[in-house]
Design a protein with these regions (language model features):
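Ordered alpha/beta subdomains of enzyme catalytic regions
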Residues: 4, 8, 17-182
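Polybasic, lysine-rich low-complexity intrinsically disordered segments
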Residues: 2, 12-13
């Protein structure tokens, strides 16, 4: 099997239905576009409605603890910081959206001049957390708060799930050595 980079470079034609984000994102790129397409259509809608600069506050929380475990262990803060610090859009990214035919020039200018301006608060990583309590709070222009929603949720959910499982295994082992295979 060919390495991922070679397979990606061989793909020269655009599929009949258009571009897929998974075809577009390569390992050499930042992960800004690795999110729900919905987030970008919402931001474009905010520009259309003229409310993109309205200040918004989003809270990250979860509704229930997996397997009735009582609590979860918060993890993923470092990854979230790295993802937020890496948010940027190239002309190639903007061209991807332009080819979709449903985004405005205001949206393209926003991407071209993007600088993350939100405030982000988080509890300390490794803290036990409980359902329906804010874990991360993002406050800033609606256009930006919306864009990081999926990225925050995916990172928080996965990293917290792994940390919670590790905590449960260690507690269940009661001091004995453990090996976990997934």
């Amino acid at each position: 099997m060919k390495p991922y980079k070679e397979m990606h470079r061989e793909q020269k034609s655009i599929p009949k239905g258009g571009l897929l984000m998974s075809d577009y994102i390569t390992r050499e790129r930042n992960l800004t576009l690795l999110t729900d397409y919905y987030e970008y259509t919402m931001v474009n809608g905010y520009f259309h409605a003229g409310i993109q600069e309205k200040i918004a506050v989003f809270d990250v929380f979860f509704r229930r603890v997996p397997e009735n475990g009582g609590f979860a262990i918060y993890a993923g803060l470092q990854q979230i910081i790295e993802l937020i610090n890496g948010l940027s859009f190239t002309e190639e990214d903007i061209e991807y959206f332009r080819k979709k035919g449903c985004f405005s020039e205001k949206f393209f200018n926003f991407l071209r001049n993007f600088k993350f301006r939100c405030d982000v608060w988080s509890i300390k990583e490794g803290t036990p957390i409980f359902p329906n309590e804010p874990i991360i709070t993002v406050r800033g222009p609606l256009e930006q708060v919306q864009m990081v929603e999926t990225m925050l949720l995916v990172t928080f959910n996965f990293e917290t799930l792994i940390a919670t499982k590790a905590s449960r295994l260690i507690r269940a082992a009661q001091g004995r050595a453990i090996v976990e295979f997934g």
